[in-house]
């Protein structure tokens, strides 16, 4: 497979919308929503931290330097954008809690502020979050483009959006996925095992994004082309589909089509199951009750079946399934934006947007879908 970045397809068909977005503490805010309530009892102090101009790992290093706590003793649920104003929860052994208030000024000098202190019986681990609330401010937006943006947001609220991995996965030079493949091929290796694992996951992310874009292409052809043209497309791709099956796919109301053999999952979390009754599963998808899952290839990955598998095969790589430490999984192809509110400030030609996304989903994917500029696999705006 060609590892150069290719343009990723959008879900909706509007023309590009021109505006300026700056990923800065003033115009981009991220607030972590924890997975569970903290009990206020236990051996782990839980602090809510606000930071700006710092990555999560840089923040942890500051805590280690100021408090004397080992980085391995600190717990966090996920990485937050360095340029944004972000809040997230960090756990540390209870014995360090008295030092927090004493070092308030030291934290503030490093662009950190402790917002709250709680306690819990376990350390926060990666993935221990429900999702994130976001605020974004778009600048230099004309009234016409504000109107177009609101129309796009109505579609996104109704149907959801592609769950692309964001640019953070691919690095400043767009080559993390290439380094990950080199590690899998034993052509490169770093002493830091976490870095090796991250780079391999970047390669998985690249394959996932590419598969999702291919599925969007197929969905658009099913929706927009005649039955005859659709059958010809599938024939050219060596994909077998009966005319009656294609008719049924065209009748699905959702823009992203559920295919025979898709792996589905109850939304926003639940068990995996196979898409057998496509009409039924498409209706559940419309109701936001279940979502098709894309492949993150690996040793224990669950593969699709039938037509879905035939499409998926192009984005599988045995080197991932043979790698002992790369277990693999499935990831939502599609996510739903919740609690979305927007406001256009005509005097400032600015558009403000607030919304919630489940964990693992990127605000940059929503930005990509709104802006609709031709970009690459790891679009930057």
UniProtKB/Swiss-Prot annotation:
Q: Which pairs are disulfide-linked?
A: none
**Active site located where?**
81
User: What Pfam families does the entry give?
Assistant: TruD
Alphabetical UniProt keywords: Isomerase, tRNA processing
The Enzyme Commission number assigned here is 5.4.99.27
Top class in the EC scheme: isomerase
List residues of the TRUD domain: 160-335
GO terms (BP aspect): tRNA pseudouridine synthesis
Q: One GO cellular component from the entry?
A: cytosol
What's the catalysed reaction? uridine(13) in tRNA = pseudouridine(13) in tRNA
What HAMAP family has UniProt attached to this entry?
TruD
What PANTHER family would the database entry show?
TRNA PSEUDOURIDINE SYNTHASE D (PTHR47811:SF1)
Q: Which function does this protein serve?
A: Responsible for synthesis of pseudouridine from uracil-13 in transfer RNAs.
**UniProt protein name:** tRNA pseudouridine synthase D
